[in-house]
Amino acid sequence: MGRYSRESDNVAKSCKARGPNLRVHFKNTHETAQAIKRMPLRRAQRYLKAVIDQKECVPFRRFNGGVGRCAQAKQWKTTQGRWPKKSAEFLLQLLRNAEANADCKGLDADRLVVHHIQVNRAQCLRRRTYRAHGRINPYMSSPCHVEVILTEKEELVSKATDDEPAKKKLSKKKLQRQKEKMLRSE
């Protein structure tokens, strides 16, 4: 079992999943993970399926050099976005794994929220491509490690309301006038 970079506050109400050395682009996966952070589990799954179908885009905020603009990015208050299909598929699979772990622990899947998701660079894999005049150039891939922690959302307790509304504070002058009116009416 690998070490996670962060531990949950309430271990009994959370579940984990991780994927080491995934053959998927680090930069695309990082942006996709940032988009689903703090989302409810069901919404995150719907969102990733929509990204695969190109119904919603992933906003590119950090690794956005050369990324084109798209209208769907407006809902994220940015202009640049893409639809990284492979990253979305990998993260969707990881969320399914975490959901299965939650089910095994007896947690309610409808109340789960993506509490923590982190994407780290893995060791680059080296291949080669052959160029003109007998030269050879590297053909590198940038895999990544992904870890996710889902936490059950706690019920918010609403503030108790008093039966009587709070009385207005009155100045001494107004209290005096009210007393005078009461005396006159009697």
Swiss-Prot record:
Pfam families: Ribosomal_L22 (PF00237). One of its GO terms (cellular component) is cytosolic large ribosomal subunit. One of its GO terms (biological process) is cytoplasmic translation. Residues 159-186 are annotated as: Disordered. InterPro entries: Ribosomal_uL22, Ribosomal_uL22_CS, Ribosomal_uL22_euk/arc, Ribosomal_uL22_sf. It comes from the Eukaryota. The keyword NADP does not apply. The modification Phosphoserine is found at residue 158. Residues 177-186 have a biased composition (Basic and acidic residues). Keywords: Phosphoprotein, Ribonucleoprotein, Ribosomal protein. GO terms for molecular function: structural constituent of ribosome. The modification Phosphothreonine is found at residue 161. PROSITE patterns: RIBOSOMAL_L22 (PS00464). The keyword Ribonucleoprotein applies. Belongs to the universal ribosomal protein uL22 family. This is Large ribosomal subunit protein uL22. It comes from Drosophila melanogaster (Fruit fly). The gene is RpL17.
